Amino acid sequence: MERSLSFEPYLLTPLDHIIKDFYVSSFISFPLHDPTTAVSALKDGVERLTRALPFLSGARVPSSKLPGKRNVMEIHPSPESLEWIPMLQIKHYRDTTLVATCSPGPTGCSDLDDSWCALPIIIPADRPSPVARFRASVFPDGILLCMTLNHAVFDGSGLGTVLKMLATCCCANSAMDHPVSLPTTYAKEASSRQIILESAAPSSGSDSEAYDRIFKSNDIIPGLDKGITSRRFSFPASKIRALKDACNAAKPTDQDPAISRNDVLTALLTICMTRARQTEQTKNLTTQLAVPVNLRRKFHPSLPDSYLGNTIIPLVVDIDPPTVPSSRCGTSPMHAHLNELTNLSLRIRKELKLLDEKDYTGGLVSYLREQSDWGATSMKFTDITVSSLRHLDINGLDFGPEIGRANSFDVQSGMYPGICDIMPTCGRDRVEDINDVPWDVCVTLEDSAWSAFMEDDLVLWALEKI
């Protein structure tokens, strides 16, 4: 199948252009008695998916379709990229096992580095930039499937949709030329891109200043010169629910918007990470938090949840240096920090509510389209970024009788310190209520900050260690 599949090249939207050109890898494990049969089913599944959506086999290349604009990119058929790396790579490992490879280490994270990925995080400029690639690492006891996507083409929701479509294609038992029913098509994707472009509306000067604050990138990835480690935590749902209830009860007025569980967990992680990283030189400095927000339902008409392209923007919040609460005998860490947690959670929620204004997305798209250099306006790197993948519903995904259900899901660890990923829900089959599923989080920090983070009384409380 490594011949080039034809499709009409298409321009990436302004929202795709604000994401830097790097790759995101996700991993799904399948314990198996007969991996050989599963490999054949996986090959067929990838081929069905690529036939249905041939642009997945394409590459991101410069475009000349917008005269007067610089650094505009499009997706184009790319036989050379398929010659370089096929859509599905298969590697066999007979001297180790799936269990050993995927077992969490002392940090709670699997040691899945670039050597297990279909593509590296950054591809050299003289190489093609493929849209998507897959890699199956085959062990005597199962398969580790890696899907690597170009983040300048897909966001987190798009990642989840591609994985679900691959599962559907692996389940299909029809002839290869028989169409598979998928939630999106080339035509539907084109329609969604058109909705984004047609949403553009004039933005005010104050709006432009707000957009400048979000998108004027510093082009410097912070902390790459420092040793970093990623750790995975599982916060009991009861703790996050208690924190949400306490923060909502502590709101200054009844008119304030309701605070969500995602809001309070983001606030908790941000406060504890900021304290852990604090030094004598930084203790009085403001910290910037970015929360990527999905805009699919903010457009008019709204985009389908199955749209694959980027619709995320960073909600940026400036955070004052953390305070040292006055400790009182018998006061839990949650109540000792309640004012700070409530204030930050409420600020996050109020910023999110601003995105509901009807003209927000139109002004945003207009601002991005008006830029003369589409490559110069991208998300800035902030001190802390908290992304949520909890809604993806990937764990337990059924890939058919030969491959089985997804046993575990993981993402490649953060590429720089300050990244937090709230992972998709897992263990839903072990609880009666989705609200009782723990909140799994992967945190990446400088090695020098981990001791303080692990000893923070708020972290210990949230993990039920005190």
Curated annotation (Swiss-Prot):
The keyword Transmembrane helix does not apply. Its EC number is 2.3.1.-. Pathway: Alkaloid biosynthesis. GO terms for molecular function: acyltransferase activity. Signal peptide: none annotated. Keywords: Acyltransferase, Transferase. It comes from the Eukaryota. The keyword Acyltransferase applies. Disruption phenotype: Abolishes the biosynthesis of communesins A and B and leads to the accumulation of communesin I, a non-acylated version of communesins A and B. Gene3D superfamilies: Chloramphenicol acetyltransferase-like domain. Coiled coil: none annotated. Belongs to the fumigaclavine B O-acetyltransferase family. Communesin N16 acyltransferase; part of the gene cluster that mediates the biosynthesis of communesins, a prominent class of indole alkaloids with great potential as pharmaceuticals. Communesins are biosynthesized by the coupling of tryptamine and aurantioclavine, two building blocks derived from L-tryptophan. This is Communesin N16 acyltransferase cnsK. The lineage of its organism: Eukaryota, Fungi, Dikarya, Ascomycota, Pezizomycotina. The gene is cnsK.
